[in-house]
Amino acid sequence: MNAYKHLIRPLLFKLNPEATHAMARALLRCPYSRRLFGGQGLFIHDERLRVNLGGLTISNPVGLAAGFDKDCDMVNSLMGLGFGYIVPGSVMYHPRPGNPCPRIIRDPEREAVYSCMGLPSRGLDYALKQLGRRRYSNVPLIINLNAENYDDYLKTFEALQPFGEALEITLYCPNRPNDAGDFLSPGVAERLLVEIVKRKKKPVFIKIPGYRSENERRKRLNLVEHILKFPLEGITITPESLVDEGRLSIGRGTVTGRPMFRQTLSVVRDVYRLTKDKWHIRASGGIFTSVDAFEAITAGASTVEIFTGFIYEGWCIARNINQGLLNLMKKFSIENVTALRGAELKIGTRLHGNGGESLIGAKQ
């Protein structure tokens, strides 16, 4: 029995989502929490899971996405939960409160979350202080940053670079007031990336949203083509999920969780066709199980990232996905995760029956 899903989660879900996160944050900031989780065998040590991600050696392809540890003050504990890497942030240069509450709504029936956080942050100085207290180096940190202008991007990038094994730059936020998405314009993005490359000493990944229409698709893939000109390591793909939601304080928000998985797969396929092996693709959106991870990697992702799945599945999610991936690779005679990447066309006829039903199994 999954103790988290059947005992702990029902109790936590009776609380306000932000109160629940505050409780989790308090626990994970505790110096002894790593010992609490460390005895549960959350790491799967197997060479078949190892990934080279833009020069970084990653022990497994399951990462914790940006947004859970916004201020980098839980990294010591999060590094003990079995993830191949952690993405703390988004770190902002200046402290900011984000949008007013309510700004998070759960949808348990769909295993989804609606949110309009608006990038709340304690600011760069606080994040640097917390990162300076990092005690472990067994799990890489890919620090995520965001900003409202060029100067803040560059100052935040330079300050964070010594503290992580890599950096991730998010080019927009759909729930931030007055964000017109200007950095998603190829010309504006190129101007920023010219300066980033001059300062770059670590691997750098760019995070952009997906798309829901053919017009958005053309624009986003055009942006990817422009970004490909730069000596960067990869791209993080998240679904485009902005919806009207009257229960949120600003009347709209993003959807994360299971409803977004098929869109994630579609975007990964498009970007993989465009980039091939030139770039690493990190898939983030609706990944809950090893079957989800398997599909995302065969579609072209190098790694997958968990956020909403962590909320619904609990602290064993990385272990469960990694163990399931090993089982699936054995079933389909795939040597390792690196060989699994982009293998969709090779094994596609064995993944689905004549009626399109999955032959993998519902959950692993």
Please tell me what each predicted stretch does.
Residues 66-69, 144-148, 208-214, 277-291:
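Glycine-rich beta-to-alpha transition loops that act as phosphate-gripper elements at the mouths
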